[in-house]
């Protein structure tokens, strides 16, 4: 090693300063190695050399152990003083102090990949681009290994996803019956994203329910209305109307409010069980008017047959006539209030203190004063207020029928003109007599009077 160092020093040139007797071999070995113009650059390029010299420097042999080569000329010149030698040695100690090796720089192609970016780093390497003929499905990762929060399908989703908490869904499944299975199945996805869409139905405690846009919600309202109609008309309502009518109406109001609440929540319940449950509720303290209390069913006289034609323009009117007519007294009261604003808005109904005196046509004293036309036919006691009425009555005894129907092909004759007019309406279909309550029309006035008795009761 000493021979190699001396040969390197011989090529660099003679040393200008003669070294000290003891330290001269050490400086002669180190100066050719670290004596470059830029020591920092040499240390960066050769990080191991500085450590190697620092490691071998304490073990260097003294100069007398190695004989000088005869080919090297003896050094001539003045020797350094002790002060300069100490200063030079201190300066050299700065270059000979052991330093930590710099952090090795790992090339880009040897960089360790992270787990979350392993599928991305392989597309940003410095290698040459791949030809377009290679199928890119080889480089696509498996979709099932991706997290659901980082993946979003680019295709437009066909189904509507409605998120509901799992606790609420389990509570509804306990209280209500499960709905029937839909007749139309969900669409099947054959793309590569089908495995993600058929993943676990519960993500972060959120229940994902997939359903198609069907008109089931719109069809549920009429069924609830049917339940409400059944609820009000069910025979299970055993409520006495004479003993506790107020409590019965309270129970009915509670059942109506519960049925209306069922329309909003779309919950189906059996009407009979609902009525049984509502009967156990305590009654309220308010009272109802007498006209709204349930009354005993009264006998309705049969309405005369309607001779309306089955034309399409009267179908809507016939459907309206199917509903029960309102109260006759309320209709008359509203008409009187319109014509006479000074009259009170309400009339006494079913009043027991004041009963109007009703007169028959034969016992009315006012009519008795005006009846001056008597029938002189033997055995007939008819009396009329007008002479025309008496003449028409006398034709019934004589059998005279001067009024003949003028309709083509009709040979009917009548003794009275009003009978001919009534008969002629059968040919024309005219119905001049109309009910003011339900707008039902009749061809005869007596049929209208018989129909009005249904509104009175």
Curated annotation (Swiss-Prot):
Pfam families reported in the protein's UniProt record: zf-C2H2
Positions of region (Interaction with WWP1): 324-328
GO molecular function: DNA-binding transcription activator activity, RNA polymerase II-specific; DNA-binding transcription factor activity, RNA polymerase II-specific; MRF binding; RNA polymerase II cis-regulatory region sequence-specific DNA binding; sequence-specific double-stranded DNA binding; zinc ion binding
Family matches, as InterPro entries: Znf_C2H2_sf (IPR036236), Znf_C2H2_type (IPR013087)
Subcellular location: Nucleus
Compositionally biased intervals (Pro residues): 65-80
Tissue expression summary: Expressed only in testis and placenta.
Cross-link (Glycyl lysine isopeptide (Lys-Gly) (interchain with G-Cter in SUMO2)): 31, 52, 94, 110
Swiss-Prot/TrEMBL domain comment: The 9aaTAD motif is a transactivation domain present in a large number of yeast and animal transcription factors.
Protein name: Krueppel-like factor 5
Organism of origin: Homo sapiens
Encoding gene (name): KLF5
């Amino acid at each position: 090693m000493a021979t190699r160092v001396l040969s390197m020093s011989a090529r660099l040139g003679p040393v200008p300063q003669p070294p000290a007797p003891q330290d001269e071999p050490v400086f002669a070995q180190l100066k050719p190695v670290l004596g470059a113009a830029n020591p920092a650059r040499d240390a960066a390029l050769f990080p191991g050399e500085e450590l190697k010299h620092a490691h071998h420097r304490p073990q260097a042999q003294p100069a007398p152990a190695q004989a000088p080569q005869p080919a090297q000329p003896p050094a001539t010149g003045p020797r350094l003083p002790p002060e300069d030698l100490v200063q030079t040695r201190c300066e050299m100690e700065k270059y000979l102090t052991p330093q930590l090796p710099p952090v090795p720089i790992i090339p880009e192609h040897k960089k360790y990949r992270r787990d979350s970016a392993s599928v991305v780093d392989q597309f940003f390497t410095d290698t040459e681009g791949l030809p377009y003929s290679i199928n890119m499905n080889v480089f696509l990762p498996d979709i099932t290994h991706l997290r659901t929060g980082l993946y979003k399908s680019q295709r437009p989703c066909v189904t509507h996803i409605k998120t509901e908490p799992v606790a609420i869904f389990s509570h509804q499944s306990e209280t209500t019956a499960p709905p029937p299975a839909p007749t139309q199945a969900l669409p099947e996805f054959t793309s590569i994203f089908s495995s993600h869409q058929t993943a676990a139905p519960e993500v972060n405690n959120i229940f994902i329910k997939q359903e198609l846009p069907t008109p089931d919600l719109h069809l549920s309202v009429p069924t609830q209305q049917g339940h409400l109609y059944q609820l009000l008309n069910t025979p299970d309502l055993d409520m006495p109307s004479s003993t506790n009518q107020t409590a019965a109406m309270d129970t009915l109001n509670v059942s109506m409010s519960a049925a209306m609440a069922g329309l909003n929540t779309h919950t189906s319940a059996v009407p009979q069980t609902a009525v049984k449950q509502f009967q156990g509720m305590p009654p309220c303290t308010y009272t109802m008017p007498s006209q709204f209390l349930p009354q005993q069913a009264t006998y309705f006289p049969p309405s005369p047959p309607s001779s309306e034609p089955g034309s399409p323009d009267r179908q809507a009117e016939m459907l309206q006539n199917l509903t029960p007519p309102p109260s006759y007294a309320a209709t008359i009261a509203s008409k009187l209030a319109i014509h006479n604003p000074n009259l009170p808005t309400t009339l006494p109904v079913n009043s027991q203190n004041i009963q109007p005196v009703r007169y028959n046509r034969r016992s009315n004293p006012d009519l008795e004063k005006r009846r001056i036309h008597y029938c002189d036919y033997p055995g007939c006691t008819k009396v009329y207020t007008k002479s025309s009425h008496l003449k028409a009555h006398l034709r019934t005894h004589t059998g005279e029928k001067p009024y003949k129907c003028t309709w083509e092909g009709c040979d009917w004759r009548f003794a009275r003109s009003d009978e001919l007019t009534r008969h002629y309406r059968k040919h024309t279909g005219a119905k001049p007599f109309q009910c003011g309550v339900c707008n039902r029309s009749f061809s005869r006035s007596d049929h209208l009077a018989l129909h009005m008795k249904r509104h009175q009761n």
